[in-house]
Structure formats: C-alpha cells, structure tokens
Design a protein with these regions (language model features):
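Mature, well-folded catalytic/scaffold domains that follow N-terminal targeting or propeptide regions
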Residues: 1-291
Length: 291
C-alpha cells in the first residue's frame, strides 16, 4: 500500500474524530488508531477494505464545531500540573482549559498529553483508553493536532467519573504471564501492558499507578497449557494482519478491530517472551467471538 496515501487518509479521519461526541467504547478514535497500527504491520498487505471501513465508520458520526478553544482564555498567573490536576478532579473543564493555556507557555504540549494519560490512569478514568489512542495518533501525525487533542482529552476526562486515589491501595507487580483471562478486564490489561512498555517521559509515575490498578485483577494463573496455531508462531503479528484481511467485511466491527490491535501491540512488546500466552488469549477471544 502507498504509505503516504494511507497516512493522509488516516490523518484526515483522526482530525475529524477529534470533533466527534460519542461513547468511549464506540468512538472512532479507537478504530483509527487500531487500523493505523494493523496496516503498519506490513504495508505490502492490501488493506483497502479496512481503510474504507475506517473512513465510512468515522463519517457515520455527527461532528460538533468545537469542544472548546485555547485562544483568548484567562490563563492564571501561576500554574502547575498540580493546578491542572485539581481542576480535572473538580470536573471543571473551563478552568482545566485555562490551566492548559498557561502550561502551554512553559511546557510542551506532548508533555501535557502524557500528564493527561497519567491522570486518567491514576484516577481510573474510563477515558484512559481514548487518551492512549490520542497519544499514539499524535506520534503518527507528528503532533499536528496537539491543541485539539488536548481539548478532546480534557473533555472526556471531565465528563466521566473518576475513582479516588489512595497510596494505601495494594500494589501488585504487573506479572502479565500470570493474568487470568476475563471478558471484563482483558482489554484494560492489554492496554496497560502496552503503556507499561512504552518509553514515556512520565514513565515512573505511570508505571506506579498501573501497578496499583492491576491489583484489582486476578494474576494467579499457573499457565500450564497454551493454545497456539503453527501459522501464528510462524508469522507473528503478521498473522493478525492477514486474518483481518481475509475476514468477510460483514464480520468487521469496531470492537473486533480494536481488540485485534490490542493483541498486536502486546505481541510487539512481548518480543517472544509471552507470545504463546498472548496467542492463547487471542484464540480464546476469537473462539467466543465467532461462536
């Protein structure tokens, strides 16, 4: 596939998605980020149908003019990330935007998105999934839509509930190979695994909060048996790209695309260490998905 054409098409979808107001689980930003990564596995595999699906899905949503602007705001004279954290806890979008406007004068917008990712993980906001997609897509588009991306993240963080943070929460070492698969938690675990292994500026704090959050999941699997296919071990992540290419278009849906990309990312960071475990989880998911 033409790499530049793909980038242009997905970049346009990404920009449009920043002005879509929908539920987190079906938001097009999830699909755009996933399609970008699946196609990136091997550009020699023709995914024109997947691109068309992504474009049509994005265009199926209504757009709002804006969630807010960072121009002409009343920026406080002294501001810190602590100020932004307080305004986010209070669900005060206007004050959060004021704080961001001030922070942008002294801080890189990329750092602000990382902070928003850290915040959403620390306070267990369901928006962390979208913020993570925003982080990855901004790398893809060379941070061309930073302001819109920040506003988008703040909007979704302030409109969703968060959980109180406590240092007293039990911390559990994130032992991915011991995770007991659960329909309710596997998506969060796979996202955490990817974030855990990403080279982030705020890595130490983010890692600490992930360790706290995974304490709520079951990591007691002795993992005596794995179920893999020979072609999965042979082709690695490329198997996922080929699988979705050969899938009948009628069976494509946002959740399947999103989940396949979560497993792709896990395989990337596993680098052979946990591959059989990841393939077993994926095969279990596909078994119940297509039953």
């Amino acid at each position: 596939m033409n790499a530049q054409l793909v980038k242009n098409q997905l970049s346009e979808c990404f920009y449009k998605s920043l002005f879509v107001n929908s539920e987190i689980s079906i938001h097009p930003i999830n699909i755009i980020s996933s399609v970008k990564s699946i196609i990136g596995i091997d550009l020699d595999i023709n995914h024109s149908s997947l691109i068309d699906y992504c474009i049509n899905y994005t265009n199926s949503f209504e757009y709002v003019d804006s969630f807010g602007v960072l121009d002409n705001l009343t920026a406080p004279p002294a501001v810190s990330f602590a100020s932004l954290e307080e305004s986010l806890i209070n669900k005060d979008m206007k004050e959060s935007l004021n704080n961001v406007a001030a922070l942008l004068k002294v801080s890189d917008g990329k750092h602000i998105i990382e902070f928003l990712l850290e915040f959403s993980i620390k306070y267990r906001s369901p928006a962390f999934q979208l913020v993570w997609c925003i982080y990855k897509m901004n790398l893809f588009v060379d941070h061309k839509n930073l302001n819109e991306s920040i506003i988008f993240c703040i909007k979704y963080i302030t409109k969703n509930d968060i959980s109180p943070f406590s240092n007293a929460d039990i911390k559990k070492k994130f032992k991915f190979d011991k995770y007991v698969f659960s329909d309710k938690s596997f998506k969060d675990v796979l996202i955490y695994y990817s974030i855990y292994n990403e080279q982030l500026i705020r890595y130490s704090k983010i890692k600490e909060y992930i360790d706290i959050n995974v304490s709520f999941f079951d990591f007691s699997d002795p993992r005596k048996h794995t179920k893999t296919k020979d072609e999965q071990l042979k082709y690695g992540r490329r198997w996922i790209s080929l699988f979705i290419k050969d899938l009948d278009e009628s069976k494509l849906n946002p959740d399947l695309i999103f989940v396949l990309d979560l497993f792709r990312s896990a395989l990337k960071f596993s680098d052979g260490k946990h591959d059989k475990i990841i393939w077993t989880m994926l095969n279990n998911y596909l078994k119940y998905y297509f039953k």
